Amino acid sequence: MKKYRVAILGATGAVGQEFLTLIEERKFPFSELRLLASSRSAGKKIAFMGKEYTVQETTPDSFEGIDIALFAGGAASKEFAPHAVKAGAIVIDNSSAFRMDPEVPLVVPEVNPEAIKAHKGIIANPNCSTIIMVMGLKPLYDIAKIRRIVVSTYQAVSGAGKEGMAELEEQVAALASGKEPVAKVLPVGKLPKHYQIAFNLIPQIDIFKDNLYTKEEMKMIDETKKIMGDDRMRITATTVRVPVYRSHAESVNVEFEDKVTLEAARAAIAAFPGIILRDNPAEQEYPMPLFTSNKYDVEIGRLRYDESQENTLNFWICGDQIRKGAALNALQIAEYMIAHDLV
């Protein structure tokens, strides 16, 4: 089997570390691995698959000779992606920098793999909450046109990176010992006001826009339409940060053009790759972050008719946003390209 020269930009962060875990787990065929990060992390040693790697500072020349560049996200993507493409690498980017660029495919491999072939050097990985939702929407969309979607999310602190996870852990420890918790990260680190996340919910993920939606909510709306290739769908979203370490959950209400039976919906979901149907109310079986953390698949349950609206179903979906919502989805894109001789 051919092996590929791979670079990981942002190798020391949560998504970058997950890339390494998945490369080993999935036996991704690499001949060279270049770990890149900011100047702050340069020189750090990372042990991986029996070898010690030194993290290098990212520069415009960092991608010479690289076949596949996995970008873990962040502001560096916009700066370095053009340099990587110029050097001949294919960039799979986890940031929001290129997602809505009409020249850049926005891809979930189970949903719209055909879009990959149109790339011009960069392929965008969707937002984590978007990926999880469209995994649930696609099997339903294939059996009936969707008219409207209402989604509310319950998003884990790891969506805010290592800092978010550390803050929850520190706050829980402080409260358990009778101390005052310190908030410095959530909802948005760069904003002046921060709130305790331990034993709390924060109805703000990212900054507010002029329409009073947050950027996270608009990402879900805009990205879903692009991935599904359907601008007619009406979508509204409310995104909430919850005191869970890992795995996002979403309550999704879907109105269809025509009636969809529960039997047809269950059959479509159960047959779809990357989804586990965990839906047995009589036995109290339903998806929870506890079940999906560190797993590849997303899980769907609580499937039921909406008693208030015709041709409408409700479902509950959970997925590991660091895996399927980020690193796994990006690696699956690379695997698809290898399998179809696109790299």
What does each of the following model-derived ranges do?
Residues 1-197, 232-234, 286-288, 298-299, ...:
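N-terminal Rossmann-like NAD(P) cofactor-binding subdomain of oxidoreductases
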Residues 117-124, 200-211, 315-317:
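Helix-loop-beta segment of a Rossmann-like dinucleotide-binding subdomain
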Residues 123-132, 212-221, 325-329:
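A glycine-rich, Thr/Ser-enriched phosphate-binding loop motif common to dinucleotide/cofactor-binding enzymes
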Residues 159-162, 209-212, 244-248, 262-263:
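Short acidic/glycine-rich loop or secondary-structure boundary segments that cap or lie
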Residues 192-244:
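Oxyanion-binding "anion nests"
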Residues 232-343:
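C-terminal active-site/capping subdomain that shapes the small-molecule cofactor and substrate pocket
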